[in-house]
Every structure is written in C-alpha cells, then in structure tokens.
Amino acid sequence: MKLTGEVALITGGASGLGRALVDRFVAEGARVAVLDKSAERLRELEVAHGGNAVGVVGDVRSLQDQKRAAERCLAAFGKIDTLIPNAGIWDYSTALADLPEDKIDAAFDDIFHVNVKGYIHAVKACLPALVSSRGSVVFTISNAGFYPNGGGPLYTATKHAVVGLVRQMAFELAPHVRVNGVAPGGMNTDLRGPSSLGLSEQSISSVPLADMLKSVLPIGRMPALEEYTGAYVFFATRGDSLPATGALLNYDGGMGVRGFLTAAGGADLPEKLNINREGQE
C-alpha cells in the first residue's frame, strides 16, 4: 500500500470521481475526511469504510464549512497530508449565444464560486495543517482547462483559472507544500449544473459520454472512474513524486494527440504486425 499512515481531505468526495478517490486512498492505506453537501452519501461512505473515513456536511463555497472540515479531519486523524479540492459543477456546454442576458451574472457566480472559490477556500482552511505536515495539494482540473469544447465559456474559464491556481499556489507554498493538478477527461458521474441556468437537477450521467468518446479518444474508450485515481495517488505519495510541484497532468485519454482524420493513428497495428489479440480487447 502506497499511502499507509497518510491522511487526506477530499471535497466533493461522496460521489463520482471524489468517491472513487476516497475508495482508492483507503485501499492504499490512507484515512480520509470528506466535505460534501449530501448527508446521505456521507453516511454511506462512513459505513463502507468504518473508522478510515469521516464525513462533514457542508458547502465548499463557505470558508467556515471548509474550516469545519479541516478541524474534523484534524480531530479524527491528527493531521492533513493531502488536500484534494475536487467538488465542481458543469455548465452543460451552454454556449455564450445561448446564455440569457439576465442570467449571465448569476451563472458566472454560481460556477466560479464552486469551481474556483471553493478551491481557494479549501487551501486556505487547510494551509496551517499542510505546512505542518509538509503535505501536498492535488487540484482536480479537467480537459476543459486545456482544450475547447469540454464545456461552455463559463466552465472552461473556471478550469483555466484552476490551472493558474496550481502554478501560483505551487510558488506561494514552496518549499513547504507541493501543489499539482490532474486534468481528467470525460467520465460517468452525477456532476450537476448551476441552478441559475435550471441545471441543478440535471446529471452528466444522462449524457451518453461513453458512446461519444469511443471514437474521439486515442485510447478508444471512456475510462472508468477508478482508472483516474492512480494519478492522485502518485502525487500524494511522498517518495515517488517529491520533485513534482506545479505539475499539470493531462489524464484524459489522449485528447491532445488526436489526429485530424482519425483519433488513433495505430488502430491497424495488430493487423500490420500479424498480431492476434482476439479476446484481449
């Protein structure tokens, strides 16, 4: 186990990628505190992991709630080694032309308050503990932090902002705290949208992402949630990732290396090399 004795705090950790991260970190020997708005899902998480996980019901937009989560983690486990600001909302690729003029301000605030301010609050709340433990921060970014069409202008702007946060925080917190970012691609989660656009009850799981990404990604399929968690484990380890701070990992199935005519240039390699891979796909 790679994280034996370590303690992590994860925001938005009761569902989706966050829950997969909790499961993986506990499996690697860590103890985990989770800040999430769903009391029911937090109870399920605590039952599943016993004394290795504690939940705090709260709003990532509130610095006081973030401080309560940090205090609960310290009370339960004595330290914070890794912080993963992960909670977010999506704009469902609402284009600028489709944003009603009377809702732009509210939608901007909704998305930026969760996706950017929530991350800043998390670091602020945990900073003394992270400096004390010489720990690390691993921000969840998105492919939208690097490429267009991963969302609309509001979501894309928030994720580009997180890229800037990684770099600035890596500078400000050095040499005491390492700060890195993981930019996953599409995944099947319960990610919701802003209430200002009437999207708070819509889930990204209703979008047929797996079918859409199959022909788009060079790896040929949409990764499962648990397949995204390894990068976070890597950045959280103290030995293997010691030189890494300010690092941005595109972990999206190869979006940046797609070809113009086809996503994967080597799709016919087994045929060319007379390799029989029947039953291995």
From Swiss-Prot:
Enzyme class: oxidoreductase
Pathway connected to this protein: Xenobiotic degradation; biphenyl degradation; 2-hydroxy-2,4-pentadienoate and benzoate from biphenyl: step 2/4
Alphabetical GO biological process terms: catabolic process
Pfam hit, one: adh_short
Record field: catalytic activity: (2R,3S)-3-phenylcyclohexa-3,5-diene-1,2-diol + NAD(+) = biphenyl-2,3-diol + NADH + H(+)
Classification via SUPFAM superfamilies: NAD(P)-binding Rossmann-fold domains
Gene3D superfamilies according to UniProt: NAD(P)-binding Rossmann-like Domain
Alphabetic keyword roster: Aromatic hydrocarbons catabolism, NAD, Oxidoreductase
Active-site residues from the entry: Y155
Residues that coordinate or bind NAD(+): 10-34
Residues annotated to bind substrate: S142
Gene Ontology MF terms: cis-2,3-dihydrobiphenyl-2,3-diol dehydrogenase activity
EC number: 1.3.1.56
Self-association state and partner proteins as the record states: Homotetramer.
UniProt similarity note: Belongs to the short-chain dehydrogenases/reductases (SDR) family.
Protein name: Cis-2,3-dihydrobiphenyl-2,3-diol dehydrogenase
Lineage of producing organism: Bacteria, Pseudomonadati, Pseudomonadota, Betaproteobacteria, Burkholderiales
